[in-house]
Amino acid sequence: MSLPQHQNRDAARRAPDDDDDAEEETMANDYREQVQYDGMDDMDRMPSISNNQDIHAQLQAAATPLEFQATLETKFASYDNYCNLFHYILNSEGPVDLEVPNYYWAWDVIDEFIYQFNSFCSYRQKVALKNDNEEEITLLRENPNTWGCYSVLNVLYSLIQRSQISEQLAAMKRGEDAALYAGEYGNRPLYKMLGYFSIIGLLRVHCLLGDFSLALKTLDDIELNKKAMFARVMAAHFTTYYYVGFSYMMMRRYADAIRMFSHILVYVSRTKNFQKNAQYDSITKKNDQMYALVAICVAFHPTRLDDTIHTALREKYGEQFNRLQRGGPDALPLFEELFRTACPKFISPTPPDFDNPEVNIDPVEHHLRIFMDEVKNNMMSPTVKSYLKLYTTMDLKKLAGFLEVEPEKLRCWLLVNKQRNRQTRWSEGGLLERRGDPQQRSRLRHGKEISSTCLRPRSAGDWSTGIFVIWPGHTKARRRASRGRPLF
């Protein structure tokens, strides 16, 4: 047996704490079970419930991917089928009495729903930008609400609310019985599972829309560990950590992003020996995207990586990885190329303007510009560091001369770098929470006023790390006071 095709789009994910071998083996067994699972066979054994519609057939259709070259009419019909299905589930008199085969199926429905939404929005945007197919433009103009952002979000939030899954998860965190908070609908597996995976769906949709903080906020009630339900479905596991990691990256929390990406890559490397051939290509493609994102994050936030990941990075990117770390103008095209390769297919929250195609903005290009602005802000860091390795003290004007920039421009860059340099890491609680003492994102530290730069180690062993510090304006007075003192 093989997995449904839509599960083949994604690969497995891995939760943060992976030291427990027994639980690791449990997750591996779950993975093997999924490899042998055929969702459509289970669907065929589900009881049919009819109320002027065949709910069984609609559930089966909801978990089945469209053909890649599906026509617009087919996509419209698929949207109508989803609307009918979710309307029946959410608005029937009382909960629908339907036993789902397992939680894999519930993920399949939500995953395919969002995938079709994303694909339709991307296709509609492409049609608007090309502006060369009047027939399709007419169809899209006449159906502005089909696969609308509001409709999709409304379904996901409604499933979460109807199932009271947030209340159930909060109760579980407190050590209470979740069933006491589930209500009439939430105690049914159909609603509980759809509600749970709708939370993961919201993470994905908000990230696609570019609201990265809200994307992370949606997971407040879900704990990122191997005991969570999403960790038992490899596609959901992969999706969760990919979008959490990408959201962290776009919020400039690179340490947290590296942590999320690393756990996925390590997990996939440990399970690849029993991955089926049907999934291999998809997993390989997603792995390449992950490694590209790790390479980007490490360029911004140098850190020690797992040996498996570090070796794979060197094999995949080699000299490109070195160019990213060196920075400078020559690295800009490489950053852009890797971002295009690894980023999600961003979408716009509103339909494009078919009457004025010149005002339409490609969402991917929009987020690429935002990302490249951050790259340019950090572009000089490696170069500055290389100069400061040669000097104990350097005047700001002298450093600006080496960099061939105006002193005031360099001062502005240093101030921006100072503002973005310190960050705290996520350890527990909501993903947006920052706990612990702020840490240096890089080894560049600043004073309140920038007039000169100094290279000083924090300890005897730190000389090799190239730590450099921007000291305040009274550095000269300190130097004058230290004249004549012995060096050691």
Swiss-Prot record:
PROSITE patterns: PCI (PS50250). The lineage of its organism: Eukaryota, Fungi, Dikarya, Ascomycota, Pezizomycotina. It is found in: Cytoplasm. One of its GO terms (cellular component) is eukaryotic 48S preinitiation complex. Residues 256-450 form the PCI domain. PANTHER family: EUKARYOTIC TRANSLATION INITIATION FACTOR 3 (PTHR13242), EUKARYOTIC TRANSLATION INITIATION FACTOR 3 SUBUNIT L (PTHR13242:SF0). InterPro entries: eIF3l, PCI_dom. Component of the eukaryotic translation initiation factor 3 (eIF-3) complex. It comes from Phaeosphaeria nodorum (strain SN15 / ATCC MYA-4574 / FGSC 10173) (Glume blotch fungus). GO terms for molecular function: translation initiation factor activity. Pfam families: Paf67. Keywords: Cytoplasm, Initiation factor, Protein biosynthesis. This is Eukaryotic translation initiation factor 3 subunit L. The keyword Nucleotide-binding does not apply. Residues 17-27 have a biased composition (Acidic residues). It comes from the Eukaryota. Belongs to the eIF-3 subunit L family. Residues 1-34, 427-449 are annotated as: Disordered. One of its GO terms (biological process) is formation of cytoplasmic translation initiation complex.
